[in-house]
């Protein structure tokens, strides 16, 4: 697998993780999580923001690198 394929794979995996974290955050707010997190909503939300920013950068890189 070359670096372009790895970029695309990383983007796919990160997108899935972002989607799952968003679902978790929605459940956290609505009080429907099936477990009690040890960290705050704010910390998880901050993680989500950083992950989404990284996804944006990664997507831009892919547009530039993969043609």
Task: Show where each model-derived region lies.
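Extended, charge-rich alpha-helical interface modules
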Residues: 1-67
């Amino acid at each position: 697998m070359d670096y372009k394929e790895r970029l695309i794979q990383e983007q796919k995996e990160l997108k899935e993780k972002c989607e799952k974290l968003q679902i978790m955050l929605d459940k956290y707010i609505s009080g429907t999580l099936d477990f009690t997190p040890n960290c705050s909503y704010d910390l998880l939300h901050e993680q989500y923001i950083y992950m989404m920013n990284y996804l944006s950068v990664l997507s831009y890189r892919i547009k530039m690198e993969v043609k």
